[in-house]
């Protein structure tokens, strides 16, 4: 049983079903991708650091795995497109890692300094002081809900909506899952908790401690809530001058700007965001966050931000609560095999769910089956949830 039907849960279910498991996916919502994975559109792009840190290398593995999954399951140009992504660092330059003469460059095919022509296409070439940016030729945009739906539609997966899991209880055969009224929802030898921030409460219930630990520090998995809001609107409602200033591909680096894909209404849209607010668990759309997104766009693409300012007065919005972990990496697989045998997690993806969820599902399945890791073994070990149970033991 997988609890959670967003990017994390659907990726876990897909990877297990591909290996012959019969998987039930339970979610409190009546439709898949109802939480953070309902983002209208978002970016898949690598993280870059001057020392090519583990997060950067993990992100490249995530991009590669995600693009392969998108190509296999979704129509290109409709639900995703490998357009490339321009990354403009507003607050500080994002340097590429150095490459010793004669050594292979780890960034080949991934990221290069943006050319003057690309800066001109984004109308960034005349800024003072001069701006710099990176070009990610492998970058893409995607509609995450479409990937969730496609993964859950695979043979061997049964989707069950309106099944809010409130409590777990160990049984001789594995685990029983109950709703808030004590009704049994499912029983299984293996359970994957992929319900975002709700994983904290479900882990507490597995110990018989109710569903809400009193503090984040009291949870064996130190998840933190991270609220985000994006602003979006119809592309054809923008002034002609704003439409003429649109970059030909997505831009990120201080929030992000995308345009051209179909929005929830079916018409081509623009989308800006997202905000980041730690500790806030409200999914209400606010005018303050629309203003914050407009300010981000103003700094990311100054001319376009000025031209689009009136559009934010009528902008629509989407907000959700994601969750992160202190080391900014997801938690995947077994958390504590002695304390919770047969209980696995896939959570803590934060703002990188689009880039890392497919890879995380493959890591979970590889751990279960004793397979070769889908990325460097040392990097795979950094994703395993058991790193937190090891830290908590004397």
What are these regions (language model features)?
Residues 24:
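Conserved beta-strand positions in the Rossmann-like core of class I SAM-dependent methyltransferases
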Residues 42-131:
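Dinucleotide-binding Rossmann-like beta1-alpha1 core, especially the glycine-rich loop
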Residues 161-175:
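A conserved short coil-to-beta-strand element within the FAD-binding core of flavoproteins
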Residues 181-190:
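Core beta-strand elements of the Rossmann-like FAD/NAD(P) dinucleotide-binding domain
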């Amino acid at each position: 049983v997988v609890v959670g039907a967003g990017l994390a849960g659907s990726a876990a279910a897909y990877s297990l079903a591909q290996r012959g498991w019969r998987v039930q996916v339970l979610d409190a919502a009546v439709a898949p991708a109802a939480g953070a994975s309902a983002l209208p559109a978002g970016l898949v792009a690598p993280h870059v650091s001057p020392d090519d840190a583990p997060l950067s290398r993990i992100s490249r593995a995530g991009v590669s795995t995600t693009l392969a999954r998108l190509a296999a399951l979704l129509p290109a140009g409709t639900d995703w497109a490998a357009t490339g992504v321009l990354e403009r660092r507003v607050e500080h330059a994002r340097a590429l890692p150095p490459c010793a003469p004669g050594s292979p460059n780890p960034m080949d095919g991934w990221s290069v300094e943006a050319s003057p022509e690309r800066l001109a296409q984004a109308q960034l070439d005349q800024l003072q002081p001069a701006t710099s940016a990176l070009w990610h030729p492998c970058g893409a945009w995607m509609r995450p809900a479409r990937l969730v739906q496609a993964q859950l539609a695979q043979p061997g997966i049964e989707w069950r909506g309106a099944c809010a899991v409130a409590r777990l209880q160990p049984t001789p055969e594995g685990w029983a899952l109950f709703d808030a009224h004590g009704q049994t929802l499912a029983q299984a030898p293996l359970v994957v908790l992929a319900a975002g921030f709700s994983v904290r409460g479900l882990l507490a219930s597995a110990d018989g401690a109710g569903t809400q630990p009193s503090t984040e520090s009291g949870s064996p998995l130190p998840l933190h809530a991270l609220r985000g809001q994006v602003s979006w609107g119809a592309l054809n409602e923008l002034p002609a001058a704003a439409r003429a200033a649109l970059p030909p591909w997505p831009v990120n680096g201080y929030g992000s700007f995308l345009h051209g894909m179909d929005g929830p209404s079916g018409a081509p849209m623009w989308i800006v965001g997202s905000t980041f607010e730690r500790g806030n668990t409200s999914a209400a759309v606010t005018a303050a966050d629309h203003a914050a997104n407009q300010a981000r766009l103003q700094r990311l693409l100054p001319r376009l931000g000025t031209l689009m300012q009136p559009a934010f007065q009528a902008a629509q919005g989407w907000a959700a609560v994601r969750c992160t972990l202190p080391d900014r990496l997801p938690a995947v697989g077994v958390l504590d095999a002695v304390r919770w045998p047969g209980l696995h997690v896939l959570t803590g993806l934060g703002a990188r769910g689009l880039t890392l969820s497919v890879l995380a599902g493959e890591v979970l399945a590889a751990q279960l089956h004793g397979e070769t890791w889908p990325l460097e073994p040392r990097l795979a070990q950094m994703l395993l949830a058991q790193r937190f149970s090891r830290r908590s033991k004397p």
